[in-house]
From Swiss-Prot:
This is 5'-nucleotidase SurE. It is found in: Cytoplasm. It comes from Methanococcus maripaludis (strain DSM 14266 / JCM 13030 / NBRC 101832 / S2 / LL). NCBIfam families: PRK00346.2-1, surE. Nucleotidase that shows phosphatase activity on nucleoside 5'-monophosphates. Its EC number is 3.1.3.5. GO terms for molecular function: 5'-nucleotidase activity; metal ion binding; nucleotide binding. InterPro entries: SurE, SurE-like_Pase/nucleotidase, SurE-like_sf. The lineage of its organism: Archaea, Methanobacteriati, Methanobacteriota, Methanomada group, Methanococci. Its main location: cytoplasm. It is an enzyme of class 3 (hydrolase). It comes from the Archaea. Its cofactor is a divalent metal cation.
Amino acid sequence: MEILLVNDDGIYSNGLLALKNVICEEFDANVTVVAPTNQQSGIGRAISLFEPLRITKTKLADCSEGYAVSGTPTDCVVLGVHQVLKKVPDYIISGINIGENLGTEITTSGTLGAAFEGAHHGAKSFACSLQVTTDHLKFKEGESPIEFMTAARIVKNVFKKFLDDEFPCDVVNINVPDNATENTPVEITKLAKRMYSMHVEERIDPRSRSYYWLDGYPVMDEEDGTDVYAVRNKRNVSVTPLTLDNTAKNIDEFKEKYGKKF
């Protein structure tokens, strides 16, 4: 079994290391780590088209070997498949992300971007994230004081359920609440409409020009059955099946209404 591990928090993230260690302990698999040199949160599925990329062999905190890529998480998947492994792995797992990836805002996530790129290449792909409620830790680069081993074991247990089965979707998105134990219930969910209520903060620089910081406030009031409600209200692990096909579900209605207008 060939597994490629990627993330968007950078190759020295404790979340990535915890996931690698748990996967290596549990499975007889060839596990390869290819991750960004620097923090890439919020980059989505961006790919580097206008600058060259470099791959650097490096040592992780446990002295195992990984490959640092001077680009995005999607670049890591592309180079991991075409240059490092030179083949499509059986599985691509992206994470563990520092902070949950919920709702339709997953399109901005580098963690999900890498997983979708993996699915695009034909690998069975997973994205995994741990809820973080302390804002200053969410975009921390490198080592973090957050405890990831429980989340890693939960991800491993979910991952095991899909082994040897016909893969039911393109990407499985796993989100673990910050207080989870290995006995925390797992719930199959759909995407909520939103994870954050967007906020723009305006500031003034020393030359009296405006500049802006983008952030948001966590949404809590999504409906039951969504990933946001499962993680933030019920404190369950959410498992959401995702597809690369972004075609609207009501395409037949769309054709009926607009098809004759063209």
